[in-house]
Design a protein with these regions (language model features):
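Glycan-recognition and catalytic cores of secretory/periplasmic carbohydrate-active enzymes
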Residues: 1-402
């Protein structure tokens, strides 16, 4: 079973046509204004300005986090998908200008990350666990694929492939390479998509390497010791990474507590988990890997039978934005991140491709109509990052999810 391309499906009327129009006409332009810091009353993005600085066009200072680039990449992916639905010359022109910035910011060896280029260039590849270099790369790859499909233009695809090649030179089984894997999973699923588009086997092999290595060594602990146990976020020495914002051991939080083929129960940060499971299921589909697929089946069954809310959302605690334990589904403290619901759809679609059974299609529909749509306001300008099942107006701390 293969997915139809977005451009091969035309929605002409009804419920989903209204949502499609909302995305095309309101959400994408509004997010463009946010990325350009034109919307008052919200935290500034500076994402585009960061690329202007990195490209040598602006003398301003970097603003944001190590993962700031990913916001722009997600917008570019949305634009690429939108252009597969209908032509929009003005939108395409804006995207092309952004892609020129990406090209100018990319380093000679393919490396591309504005935070590490502008703020801590000496620390590139030194904190894979916390700093999202590989996560951002994954979102760039997905954006490049979508934009290539939407326009036929390959400039951003060449940028993405150059970055993927840079990563391939840095990570792998060879003795002189780093024997690690992404702290925040995302790159793995993107590499499989890149293989599907380019038919370059090296991208599939790199995705396999990241999945196969996870949980088999002490890479994250070793790099933690090398940086003298300093946390990126607090700049202070800590006993364990990530403990600042979650209650779980970081091995489970980051899903490297076991090799992936031994993992049978969903645990840790929900978005990281389902992104990884998506890549696992996609690799199983490509390679006929029964052992990997068996693990995916156990993980999917665990989530859908024991760790999912009635509305199809996942992640029952804001502490680590995470899964907790079987049947622990409180309504007053759940997190239910919108990204996690989308990731669960990605995972479930790959399971549908593998098994071709209606339970997977039904689950996609169930999550889409409930846990995903709840994250987007009907005006296209208001969003829920997390989706509380229950919230008292006087509980200001719960309002932080809006």
């Amino acid at each position: 079973m293969k997915a139809l391309e977005i451009g091969n499906v035309k929605i002409t009327s009804g419920f989903w046509k209204e949502y499609q129009e909302l995305i095309l006409k309101k959400v994408i332009p509004y997010q463009w204004d946010i990325l350009n810091d034109k919307v008052k009353g919200i935290e500034k993005s500076h994402a585009i300005d960061n690329f202007r600085i990195a490209a040598g066009i602006s003398n301003d200072k970097f603003y944001g986090e190590a993962y700031q680039d990913s916001d722009l990449y997600k917008w570019l992916e949305a634009v690429g998908n939108a252009l597969q639905v209908e032509n929009n010359i003005e939108l395409e022109k804006k995207a092309d200008e952004v892609i020129d910035l990406l090209e100018g910011a990319q380093e000679e060896d393919g490396y591309l990350n504005t935070y590490f280029k502008l703020v801590e260039p000496e620390k590139k590849w030194s904190n894979i666990l916390e700093c999202h270099e590989l996560y951002c790369a994954g979102h760039l790859i997905e954006a490049a694929i979508a934009y290539y499909k939407g326009t036929g233009k390959d400039k951003i695809l060449k940028i993405a492939c150059k970055l993927a090649d840079c990563i391939n030179e840095k990570f792998g089984p060879e003795e002189w390479k780093m024997h690690g894997y992404p702290g925040h999973q995302e790159l793995e699923l993107a590499l499989v998509k890149l293989y599907d588009l380019t038919n370059e086997n090296k991208y599939l092999k790199l995705a396999e390497y990241f999945i196969d290595m996870r949980g088999t060594n002490q890479f994250f602990e070793e790099e933690f010791i090398k940086r003298k146990r300093i946390c990126h976020w607090t700049k202070c020495k800590v006993e364990e990474p990530n403990r600042r914002y979650n209650q779980f051991p970081y091995q489970e939080y980051n899903q490297f507590h076991q090799p992936v083929r031994m993992q049978k129960k969903a645990t840790g940060h929900a978005v990281r988990a389902v992104y990884m499971y998506t890549a696992m299921a996609d690799l199983a589909y490509h390679n006929g890997d029964k052992e990997l697929l068996d693990s995916c089946k156990s993980l999917w069954d665990n989530i859908t039978n024991k760790q999912i809310y009635i509305n199809g959302s996942i992640g029952s605690t804001p502490s680590g934005e995470a899964f907790t334990k079987d049947y622990d589904l409180p309504n007053d403290t759940n997190y239910s991140e919108t990204c996690a619901a989308l990731g669960m759809i990605f995972f479930t679609f790959k399971m549908l491709q593998n098994f071709e059974q209606s339970c997977y299609a039904d689950t996609i529909e169930y999550i889409f109509y409930n846990a995903v749509l709840s994250g987007l306001g009907l005006d296209g300008e208001h969003f829920f990052y997390a989706n509380p099942m229950e919230m008292l107006p006087r509980r200001r701390d719960r309002k932080s999810v809006v």
